[in-house]
């Protein structure tokens, strides 16, 4: 009887372990603030738990990539919900190939690392071969495409 109970407990733990491991707390992100970016896709990582968009922001004039202290492109990581939700919204490697210009807001990491969570922000892709006017985002470009619900949030407090 005791062996059966231990066996069942082990099976239960084994079944729940992937669920517990698949998600993490959002405490690392400042959900009270949005940073809004227009950037260029470097790569897409469709992780099952959290879809990631790696990108380099464009400067406010929209004519150059933002660079770090060493002159290298400053790559940010935008975490989204699951790959299944991203697919439902139409966000795939094929719909966002390397070099795609897009805009979205993210809740930045509290530790200052160049990463954040999309939250409820809209995601807009500029029409191929276009970019926004200085200080604007892809939602202002003729022929833009929206992915999922939401609008580009205002920079600052959410």
Enumerate the predicted regions with their spans:
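Boundary at the C-terminal end of the N-terminal hydrophobic targeting segment
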Residues: 20-27
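Positively charged n-region of N-terminal signal peptides that target proteins for export
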Residues: 1-4
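Bacterial N-terminal signal peptides
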Residues: 7-17
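Short amphipathic alpha-helical "recognition" segments used for binding
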Residues: 6-7, 83
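Generic detector of short, well-ordered, non-transmembrane alpha-helical segments enriched
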Residues: 18-19, 95
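Short, functionally important structural connectors and interaction interfaces within domains
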Residues: 7-8, 21, 88
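PEST-like low-complexity, intrinsically disordered acidic/proline/serine-rich tracts
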Residues: 27-158
